[in-house]
UniProtKB/Swiss-Prot annotation:
Residue runs in coiled coils: none
Biological function: Catalyzes the covalent attachment of the prokaryotic ubiquitin-like protein modifier Pup to the proteasomal substrate proteins, thereby targeting them for proteasomal degradation. This tagging system is termed pupylation. The ligation reaction involves the side-chain carboxylate of the C-terminal glutamate of Pup and the side-chain amino group of a substrate lysine.
MF annotations from Gene Ontology: ATP binding; ligase activity, forming carbon-nitrogen bonds; magnesium ion binding; ubiquitin-like protein transferase activity
Keyword Transmembrane recorded: no
Name by which UniProt lists this protein: Pup--protein ligase
Source organism per UniProt: Salinispora arenicola (strain CNS-205)
Broad EC category: ligase
Positions of ATP binding: R53, T66, W419
Key words, A-Z: ATP-binding, Ligase, Magnesium, Metal-binding, Nucleotide-binding, Ubl conjugation pathway
Length: 452
């Protein structure tokens, strides 16, 4: 596909503490967080003026789904806009708590595991053609996705019976299948539930649930950008070496537990190969593909960065990518902290630091602190993120949804929307079905808006 629709859905961890003790249950915190949303949206599941969806997911996890984006750069800005919107809800909820005489601080974490061992995800969505072979797509993608954590993991200190280990990925321990139609019970790498949110005769939505939530914009750019290039190669019929893994679920854990990328995983053919070698194989094909096809600036940046990360892992000198890749940034922070205070990796203060990296509250979260000090690289600007909080992407269906919502709210009209429907809840119950996610202008929607 020359143009592709991308979307990210991020579930956030939530807690409320007072002097280190848990103050409210996650359910109660979530209710406070969403009270403002419910007051104007009459629901804890709403679509916003920027085309995004904000809702309370299973287990009291606030979830933000970006609007449909047709560029990875746009997606990065809209993902960050979601963080800012949730941070606004957090500030509001804390004020309300204090007004009611409840002391405590609310925390929102953009991570993937809590202290009780529960996991929540960052789901990537890629629109693909209905006419390709979905099975082949999965076969080629799974070895890539299993080893992709080497270039875009969020990093995690994992406590094991044999002591603490620093892992590449937070999500790896919680993936139980290769391909499946469930997302919570079995947690596959690729979810096959067929909900394209588009014309089902033309499109499928590839739903990848194996990735970590990233704090660094550049890591997000690489995560989605590299997957997009691999998808384009498959769609273009690029011949790939058969790297089918004997046991993807065992492999994903083995890869996560080895930050050198050298541990061998077994292929279905019986051959053994390292995560680094698998990624190098995909990168070589991707570089050649982008050069031959003449990719855009983002594709060129992705391939260049991908190469630098793999070189850093191969040489063992991670410093050249410490400003760009989450797991490396966090590892360096932890190593400095350990050195300064002479602490083992298993120390509770190290675990606290691991968590603080993902704290969304600017001025308190560790990642936000690094960003303010200019110690990490960016892939979006603050004005772009600010604009994305209110304004949908202008080249996709999200524009139609955002415009419809804005006008309906300004005219105080009752309405219902989802990814494909726009409906005015008046006597006529007029509804427009928007099946084409690439279509940003539609006379039917304009007529519906004009009729308000």
């Amino acid at each position: 596909m020359e143009r592709r629709i991308f979307g990210l859905e991020t579930e956030y961890g939530v807690t409320c503490t007072y002097r280190g003790q848990r103050r409210l249950s996650p359910d109660e915190v979530a209710r406070y967080l969403f009270r403002r949303v419910v007051s104007w949206g009459r629901s804890s599941n709403v679509f916003l003026r920027n085309g995004a969806r904000l809702y309370l997911d299973v287990g009291s996890h606030p979830e933000y789904a970006t609007p449909e984006c047709d560029s990875v750069a746009d997606l990065v800005a809209h993902d960050r806009a979601g963080e800012r919107i949730l941070e606004g809800l957090l500030v509001d909820a804390e004020k309300r708590l204090h007004d009611e005489g409840i002391a405590g601080e609310i925390y929102l974490f953009k991570n993937n595991t809590d202290s009780a061992g529960n996991s929540y995800g960052c789901h990537e969505n890629y629109l693909v053609s209905r006419h390709g072979e979905f099975g082949r797509l999965a076969d080629v993608l799974i070895p890539f996705l299993v080893t992709r954590q080497l270039i875009c993991g969020a990093g995690k200190v994992l406590q094991t019976p044999r002591g603490a280990v620093y892992c590449l990925s937070q999500r790896a321990e919680h993936i139980w299948e290769g391909v499946s139609s469930a997302t919570t019970r079995s947690r596959p790498i690729i979810n096959t539930r067929d909900e394209p949110h588009a014309d089902a005769e033309r499109y499928r939505r590839l739903h990848v649930i194996v990735g970590d939530s990233n704090m660094n914009e550049v890591t997000t750019l690489l995560k989605v950008g590299a997957a997009d290039i691999v998808l384009r190669m498959i769609e273009s019929g690029v011949v790939m070496r058969d790297l089918t893994l004997e046991n993807p679920i065992r492999a994903i854990r083995e890869v996560s537990h080895d930050i050198t990328g050298r541990r061998k995983v077994r292929l279905a053919s019986g051959k053994e190969i390292s995560a680094l070698e698998i990624q190098q194989e995909y990168l070589a094909k991707a570089t050649e593909f982008v050069e031959r096809r003449g990719g855009d600036q983002t594709a060129k940046r992705v391939v260049e960065l991908w190469g630098r990360v793999l070189r850093a892992v191969e040489t063992g000198d991670l410093d050249p990518v410490a400003r760009e890749i989450d797991w490396v940034t966090k590892l360096r922070l932890i190593e400095r902290y350990q050195g300064k205070h002479d602490l083992p990796l298993s120390h509770p203060r190290v675990a606290q630091m691991d968590l603080a990296y993902h704290d969304l509250r600017r001025g308190r979260g560790l990642y936000g602190l690094l960003e303010r000090r200019g110690q990490v690289d960016r892939a979006a600007t603050d004005p772009e993120i600010f604009e994305a909080k209110e304004t949908p992407p202008q080249t996709t269906r999200a524009r139609l949804r955002g415009e419809f919502i804005r006008h309906a709210q300004e005219k105080r009209r009752d309405f219902t929307v989802d990814w494909v429907h726009l409906k005015l809840n008046d006597q006529a119950q007029r509804t427009v079905l928007c099946k084409d996610p690439f279509r940003a202008y539609d006379e039917r929607v304009e007529r519906l808006i004009a009729s308000m």
